[in-house]
UniProtKB/Swiss-Prot annotation:
F-type ATPases have 2 components, F(1) - the catalytic core - and F(0) - the membrane proton channel. F(1) has five subunits: alpha(3), beta(3), gamma(1), delta(1), epsilon(1). F(0) has three main subunits: a(1), b(2) and c(10-14). The alpha and beta chains form an alternating ring which encloses part of the gamma chain. F(1) is attached to F(0) by a central stalk formed by the gamma and epsilon chains, while a peripheral stalk is formed by the delta and b chains. It is found in: Cell inner membrane. This is ATP synthase subunit c. F(1)F(0) ATP synthase produces ATP from ADP in the presence of a proton or sodium gradient. F-type ATPases consist of two structural domains, F(1) containing the extramembraneous catalytic core and F(0) containing the membrane proton channel, linked together by a central stalk and a peripheral stalk. During catalysis, ATP synthesis in the catalytic domain of F(1) is coupled via a rotary mechanism of the central stalk subunits to proton translocation. PROSITE patterns: ATPASE_C (PS00605). Keywords: ATP synthesis, Cell inner membrane, Cell membrane, CF(0), Hydrogen ion transport, Ion transport, Lipid-binding, Membrane, Transmembrane, Transmembrane helix, Transport. The keyword Transmembrane applies. The lineage of its organism: Bacteria, Pseudomonadati, Pseudomonadota, Gammaproteobacteria, Pseudomonadales. It comes from the Bacteria. It comes from Pseudomonas syringae pv. tomato (strain ATCC BAA-871 / DC3000).
Amino acid sequence: METVVGLTAIAVALLIGLGALGTAIGFGLLGGKFLEGAARQPEMVPMLQVKMFIVAGLLDAVTMIGVGIALFFTFANPFVGQLAG
């Protein structure tokens, strides 16, 4: 049982850590492309900004879903119940 709990803790750490890393890379790419587009066509900045914020919200939502799944595995681990039964 300790092995399952330990491996679950490692999986949770990887899920949160890699999710944060992916979000950071995504925000960096998104901001860079927004600045490129704004510098190339300044008259399109309001439309690009709205689209950037929508994509940023979706990008952040993926990470929050990952954190929710990680918290589920941390506090309500379904694998421990299968070992007892």
